[in-house]
Amino acid sequence: MSGGAGIPDVPAFDASDVRLAIVASTWHTKICDALLAGARNTAADSGIDNPTVVRVLGAIEIPVVAQELTRNHDAVVALGVVIRGETPHFDYVCDAVTQGLTRVSLDSSTPVANGVLTTNSEEQALNRAGLPTSDEDKGAQATAAALTTALTLRELRAEA
């Protein structure tokens, strides 16, 4: 995966024996479907042809489903989008999702990569969704983060 401004270059790696799950919301379908496509492509490039994919309605549902997926997967990728509106709802949802995913990852000792976009506008989300006109592919980046972290944890545990 090639990096852009501040984005690290991630060399090719083999994660074919990593059990990967992806949980993606369905709000803002075009954006979430693009994030999921980027995640699937990175998984395939890493040797994973059939990751478990679960779709949920909104971002707030992602942490509890991610928690369940950590029970029998080595890595989980969380994908979705929350776009700022006119009420504090945005702040509450973003905080709950971020804290929830972090807690799930730490409690389960399983990497849970946060690919939930939290943007001020739909345009910002589209620019990060991995579409042909996007500058970034956060679905791909989150998947690379989850898989490389799973491989790192495997190495550390083998040394213990």
UniProtKB/Swiss-Prot annotation:
5-amino-6-(D-ribitylamino)uracil binds at residues 27, 59-61, 81-83, 114. GO terms for molecular function: 6,7-dimethyl-8-ribityllumazine synthase activity. GO terms for cellular component: cytosol; riboflavin synthase complex. The keyword Metal-binding does not apply. GO terms for biological process: riboflavin biosynthetic process. Gene3D superfamilies: Lumazine/riboflavin synthase. Keywords: Riboflavin biosynthesis, Transferase. The keyword Hydrolase does not apply. HAMAP family: Lumazine_synth. This is 6,7-dimethyl-8-ribityllumazine synthase.
